[in-house]
Amino acid sequence: MFKKIGIAVSFSPYGKSLFKIAAFLQKELSSQLYLMHIGNFSEEKENRVKALAQEFNIDESAYKIEFKKDEPSKALAKFVETENLDLLILGALEKETTLKYYIGSVARNLMRSAPTNLLICPAKKEADFEFNNLFITTDYSSRSETAIKFL
């Protein structure tokens, strides 16, 4: 199923909820997590990522941390291809400004071109999550069939 799961790590108030989802899936599927932060590397940032992983009881052998400095959509797409990820988890703000609507958001750009399955979660400040509604698009490929069977 999803053996290699990527997560777009941000240090926003919403980042914890994405980590909780990733930790849940990692444990349920015995997957390897690939944690990607867009920005310059620093030990302080790496320690923050490790602290989040530890908070959700993710074993150090179950994840790999990457830092990339590039436009977020491009960096994440390259990351997906380089690591051959089966799933990428990222957050999305529910409300966008008009400017962002026309220029495009990271989530929107990846929905159009990501070479893998995406799990896009609305931003929530609390770490609790529950899936009430799922929206699934398909191109009727074997990859899509695998994702739908997972549900």
Where is each model-derived feature located?
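Short acidic/Ser/Thr-enriched loop-to-helix initiation segments
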Residues: 1-34, 125-151
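Flexible loop residues that form catalytic
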Residues: 10, 38-41, 93, 139
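Residues at secondary-structure transition points
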Residues: 13, 67-74, 101, 105, ...
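Hydrophobic alpha-helical membrane-association signature
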Residues: 18, 45-48, 106, 147
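Acidic, proline/glycine-rich short linear motifs
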Residues: 20-59
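General small-molecule cofactor/ligand-binding pocket signal
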Residues: 34-36, 64-68, 119
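Structural beta-alpha unit
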Residues: 41, 54-88, 96-97
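Gly/Ser-rich helix-loop-strand patches that form or flank binding pockets
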Residues: 76-127
